[in-house]
């Protein structure tokens, strides 16, 4: 059971884990041991609340297939257990991030000090430009 928050949990049956051989350098260990984890999570068929499903499917993430299946590949660590924990943590992190809503920006008005500084600067510039004109003797 993967716990996302106090009231959101994912049963282990909804998360499909397959173990494959990792890529890259590592010599004999990499060639013989299936330490990388391939996690598949079917978003539409999951028991997540609809709000989370909609937000996850709306993400423009290359890890989500056209069918709505999220694929995470974890091969950073040397052991299968560490890679499994990493894949599950990344899944939980993605679901939590999708559940967060951004606060709306409340527009603010310029302060009195900023208005006066702006007007003083304009007045100063005006006198500089006025001094560039023709001079009568």
From Swiss-Prot:
Pfam family, one: RF-1
The protein's name: Peptidyl-tRNA hydrolase ArfB
Annotated family: Belongs to the prokaryotic/mitochondrial release factor family.
SUPFAM superfamilies (UniProt xref): Release factor
Top-level taxonomy: Bacteria, Pseudomonadati, Pseudomonadota, Gammaproteobacteria, Pseudomonadales
Annotated PANTHER family: PEPTIDYL-TRNA HYDROLASE ARFB
Primary location recorded for the protein, binned into one broad class: cytoplasm
Keyword Hydrolase: yes
Region: Disordered, residue numbers: 102-137
This protein's record includes keyword Phosphoprotein: no
Keywords, comma-separated and alphabetical: Cytoplasm, Hydrolase, Translation regulation
GO biological process per UniProt: regulation of translation; rescue of stalled ribosome
